[in-house]
Amino acid sequence: MAGHSKWATTKHKKAANDAKRGKEFAKLVKNIEVAARMGGGDPSANPTLDDMIKKAKKASVPNDNIERARKRGSGEEAGGADWVPIMYEGYGPNGVAVLIECLTDNRNRAATEVRTAMSKNGGNLGETGSVSYMFTRTGIVQVKKGELTEDDVLIAVLEAGAEEVNDLGEVFEITCEPTDLEAVKAALVDAGIEIEDADSDFRASVEVPLDAEGARKIFRLVDALEDSDDVQNVYTNITLSDEVLAELENDE
């Protein structure tokens, strides 16, 4: 855990057990298929597809699975599903705002599974717009520190549209408008700086501080939501102090 700044609203990482790993593989493969359908099957001409393939490889998804998903999405191979993106929103315990990104081929199933996970874990689904106004989609790029200074990174990306460079301990995090994400990545490559991760994320303008027990309730809710194959990402507006993070690290 890199500190409460990273935990404020970012996606909650899953435990790397076999069941979770299998679900994570399925979601990464789904993203490849959708990216290929939207922008074509050539990664060199489709930055989103290129990103999704890199993420899948980093997570050790087998190359055969990656290639089949790319072909299904581009139409080179039959069998692709009609994936539809849906965003659900609502509140968890302690008034925490929750955004749930889904990618599904069955709207009714997705809605039922999300509603069940929320209601069983102290949450409630809200109307469209009930919490999304608290979040802003933000481009996020992370680079490993190594010998780099914050100024090194800032100089490399400032003219590409970067807004901030934050020190998260082992990595520097660069924020930008989602539309500037590719330009920021290109600027880093030109400067010889290796990219650790890049994505668009939701960041909250209003944060809810929680104690350890409150955090555990939210983590249980997030885990229940992410157990659904249709749920891609879950975002919250919690913020955790260093003391709470230290207490949580003692949990098994």
From Swiss-Prot:
KW DNA-binding (keyword) present: yes
Pfam families in alphabetical order: TACO1_YebC_N (PF20772), Transcrip_reg (PF01709)
GO cellular component: cytosol
GO MF annotation terms: DNA binding
Protein location: Cytoplasm
Keywords in alphabetical order: Cytoplasm, DNA-binding, Transcription, Transcription regulation
Segments for region (Disordered): 1-22
Main location: cytoplasm
Gene Ontology BP, a term: regulation of DNA-templated transcription
Similarity comment: family membership: Belongs to the TACO1 family.
NCBIfam families in the record: PRK00110.1 (NF001030), PRK12378.1 (NF009044), YebC/PmpR family DNA-binding transcriptional regulator (TIGR01033)
Protein known as: Probable transcriptional regulatory protein CE1776
